[in-house]
């Protein structure tokens, strides 16, 4: 089974990806892991990526696409299938993935889209607070400290509501064309992500068993 998993930051995509991989025994391909492995193994694309990263530059699409292609060409993929997590991030990368899969004789079976209302995500992501003395992390709503005093805690810049909202807006603008592309191919299953983790996975599992 060959899958993509999509969802906005904070939707619980990483948690569900780990559960899918454990339950179905498929290869988890996350962008970060792919880059690290390609650079550690000094593949052609890994060396290219490192040259950009070392200069503090963004890795261009053709290198990212090349790293994905190298990984999808490995033997375990044909045997186990894959779950792509964090790629494609743009519609151009989605088109490159289509071409790569066709070239390698692979087929995408489904796209799992974890849906959560953006306003809920702002609450989830902007509630994180850190104790000034201990560095411990808490959440104002979901995991509040017992002895909360505002002056004892601070919030990182990128956890502030306005920053979180901007990040979500960027992700939505990039993600919508990709979802639309795969919807036209009849591949997308929307999963309600604003429920307990186990309930989300029950819905994911049901959808995947129907694909098999």
From Swiss-Prot:
Annotated localization: Cytoplasm
Biological process annotations from GO: AMP salvage
Pathway listed: Purine metabolism; AMP biosynthesis via salvage pathway; AMP from ADP: step 1/1
Region (NMP): 30-59
Annotated Pfam families: ADK
InterPro entries registered for this protein in UniProt: Adenyl_kin_sub, Adenylat/UMP-CMP_kin, Adenylat_kinase_CS, P-loop_NTPase
Annotated residues for binding of ATP: 10-15, 128, 137-138, 195
SUPFAM superfamilies the UniProt entry points to: P-loop containing nucleoside triphosphate hydrolases
Protein EC: 2.7.4.3
NCBIfam families the UniProt entry points to: adk, PRK00279.1-2, PRK00279.1-3, PRK00279.1-4, PRK14527.1
Family, as annotated: Belongs to the adenylate kinase family.
HAMAP family named in the record: Adenylate_kinase_Adk
Name this polypeptide is given: Adenylate kinase
Organism: Streptococcus pyogenes serotype M1
Taxon lineage: Bacteria, Bacillati, Bacillota, Bacilli, Lactobacillales
Protein encoded by which gene: adk
């Amino acid at each position: 089974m060959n899958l993509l998993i999509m969802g906005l930051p904070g939707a619980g995509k990483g948690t569900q990806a780990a559960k899918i991989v454990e339950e179905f025994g498929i290869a988890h391909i996350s962008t970060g892991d792919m880059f690290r492995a390609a650079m550690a193994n000094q593949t052609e694309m890994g060396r290219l990526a490192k040259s950009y990263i070392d200069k503090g530059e963004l890795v261009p699409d053709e290198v990212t696409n090349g790293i994905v292609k190298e990984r999808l060409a490995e033997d375990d993929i044909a045997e186990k299938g894959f779950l792509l997590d964090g790629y494609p991030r743009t519609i151009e990368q989605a088109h490159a993935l289509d071409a790569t899969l066709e070239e390698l004789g692979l087929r995408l079976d489904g796209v799992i889209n974890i849906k959560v209302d953006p306003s809920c995500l702002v609450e989830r992501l902007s509630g994180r607070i850190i104790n000034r003395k201990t560095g411990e992390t808490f959440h104002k709503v979901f995991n509040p400290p017992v002895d909360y005093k505002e002056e004892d805690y601070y919030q990182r810049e990128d956890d502030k509501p306005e920053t979180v909202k901007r990040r979500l807006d960027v992700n939505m603008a990039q993600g919508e064309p990709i979802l639309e592309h795969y919807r036209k191919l009849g591949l997308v299953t929307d999963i309600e992500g604003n429920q307990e983790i186990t309930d989300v996975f029950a819905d994911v599992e049901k959808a995947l068993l129907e694909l098999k």
